[in-house]
Swiss-Prot record:
Residues of the active site: 93 (proton donor)
Entry GO MF terms: orotidine-5'-phosphate decarboxylase activity
Pfam families: OMPdecase (PF00215)
Catalytic activity reported: orotidine 5'-phosphate + H(+) = UMP + CO2
UniProt cross-references to InterPro entries, sorted A to Z: Aldolase_TIM (IPR013785), OMPdecase_AS (IPR018089), OMPdecase_type-2 (IPR011995), OMPdeCOase_dom (IPR001754), RibuloseP-bd_barrel (IPR011060)
Identification of the protein by name: Orotidine 5'-phosphate decarboxylase
SUPFAM superfamilies in UniProt: Ribulose-phoshate binding barrel
Transmembrane segments: none
Length: 277
């Protein structure tokens, strides 16, 4: 089954388009997980326990796992999320060529261990850099299209000789690369007008829409324009997983209050987004 079919099933089951970003910043982990063998894995496990009823997907960011214990934590996290029947989108933003790209793409192969169901990629090096990902037809490939960070406009707004902006060209290319029906686009929620414009350019490609949580993006626009035939994801990372930091300032040796707050935050975002579905 293709990734977007699996995602559609999960969206229907959870009645949710919420992607929960699993970015376990070591400096912000609660005391209740610090004595564990793998603190990041212990943290993610408890976040998943608290949020899985409201999650359409989990999105671990590879930068928080790129050390030996981190990769172990990531493998455990992927396996545990799958045990809850929630797909995993690895936010790695890979972009390289040849053997390096093929090596990066192995994170999508189940014979290499717990495999991510989808991945984010950087299209700057062109199609051949993405081909090892695209050819895995059952895995999702989310191409960076229009990002929500302020500096994104430095390159993405550049006007080409054709008259289109660079990000618009990337969007068109992503559509061309979608021969296996496994391509999505990363499109930030901080500019609703651009989100609408990009949806008009590619009516059938699901979006991963970051920026609705801590970055203050537009939830209504994220849902209205981010979904293709009801399929798409709206991500919140820090706004969910660290929602309990205030609760943790009180005596909470077990961490129960911290993780309960994460669950409540995921539920609230689901309800907020569902108003516009």
């Amino acid at each position: 089954m293709h990734f977007f079919d699996r995602l559609a099933d999960r969206i229907a089951t959870a009645d949710s388009v919420v992607s929960v970003g699993l970015d376990p910043d070591p400096a912000r982990l609660p005391d209740s997980v610090l004595d564990a063998d793998l603190p990041r894995w212990q943290f993610n496990r408890r976040i998943i326990d608290a949020t899985h009823e409201h999650a359409a997907c989990y999105k671990p960011n590879a930068a928080f796992y790129e050390d030996p214990d981190g990769w172990r934590a990531l493998e455990e996290t992927i396996a545990y999320a799958h045990g809850k029947n929630v797909p995993v989108l690895l936010d790695a933003k890979r972009g390289d060529i040849g053997n390096t790209a093929r090596q990066y793409a192995q994170i999508l192969d189940e014979d290499e261990g717990p495999a991510a169901d989808a991945i984010t990629v950087n299209p700057f090096l062109g199609r051949d850099s993405l081909e090892p990902f695209l050819q895995r037809a059952d895995r999702g490939v989310f191409v960076l299209g229009r990002t929500s960070n302020p500096g994104g406009e430095d390159l993405q707004d550049l006007e080409l000789a054709s008259g289109e902006k660079l990000y618009e060209r990337v969007v068109h290319l992503a559509d061309l690369w979608n021969g296996n029906g496994n391509v999505g686009l990363v499109v930030g929620a901080t500019n609703p007008d651009e989100l609408e414009e990009i949806r008009e350019l590619v009516p059938d490609i699901p979006f991963l829409v970051p920026g609705v949580g801590a970055q203050g993006g537009d939830a209504e626009a994220a849902v209205e324009h981010g979904l293709a035939d009801g399929v798409g994801l709206v991500n919140s990372s820090r706004g969910i997983i660290f929602a309990g930091e205030d609760a943790a300032t009180r005596r909470d040796d077990s961490g129960d209050a911290f993780f309960k707050a994460a669950g409540q935050s995921a539920k609230q975002l689901k309800q907020r987004l569902n108003q516009f579905r």
